[in-house]
């Protein structure tokens, strides 16, 4: 199975052409969040339509820079990974969008308790899968992936522990 996952598009789909062959032959595309820059449904739809030109098999979640409307829109489209789990063959994919609180006060920050609840809910849907993939927009705390420009760690302890 070929799964391609990426995030932080922030409405810029110009680089999709660079990975067109990979996108076209993937079994699944996973978008991990930050589809927009503090925008909603209309901008999200543009991003999704751009990806769907290459592959219609998508699972998507919102990021901390997407407004909550994006989360609701993805649910109406039946592709929302946030707090959800999907079986794709023998692979279970579950996720949590948004982010733990940051110094930037972005539109979609959620508590560590909520992150745990969303991850648990999604995991429970795929717990019997042979293989499991956890997709989180917020990185695990105190790792190389959660360091912000001032050197501070801004990731989630819950993601790290899970």
Give short role names for the model-derived ranges:
Residues 11, 66-158:
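Conserved catalytic scaffold of divalent metal-dependent phosphoesterases
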Residues 19, 46-50, 118, 155-162:
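A general structural detector for well-ordered alpha-helical segments in enzyme core domains, enriched
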Residues 6-88:
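Core catalytic region of metal-dependent phosphoesterases/phosphodiesterases
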Residues 59-60, 92-93, 161:
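Broad hydrophobic/π-residue packing in well-ordered secondary structure
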Residues 1-4:
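Extreme N-terminal starter segment of soluble prokaryotic enzymes
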């Amino acid at each position: 199975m070929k799964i391609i996952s990426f995030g932080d598009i922030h409405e810029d789909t110009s680089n999709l052409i660079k990975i067109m062959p990979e996108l076209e032959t993937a079994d699944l595309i996973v978008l991990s969040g930050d589809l927009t820059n503090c925008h909603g449904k209309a901008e999200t739809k543009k991003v999704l339509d751009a990806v769907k030109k290459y592959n219609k098999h998508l699972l998507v979640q919102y990021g901390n820079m997407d407004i909550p409307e994006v989360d609701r829109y993805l649910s109406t489209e039946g592709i929302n990974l946030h707090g959800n789990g999907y079986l794709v063959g023998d692979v279970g994919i579950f996720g949590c969008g948004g982010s733990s609180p940051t110094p930037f006060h972005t539109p979609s920050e959620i508590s560590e308790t909520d992150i745990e609840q969303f991850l648990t809910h999604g995991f429970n849907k795929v717990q019997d899968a042979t293989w499991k993939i956890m997709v989180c927009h917020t990185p695990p705390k105190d790792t190389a992936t959660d360091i912000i420009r001032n050197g501070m760690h801004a990731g989630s302890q819950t993601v790290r522990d899970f």
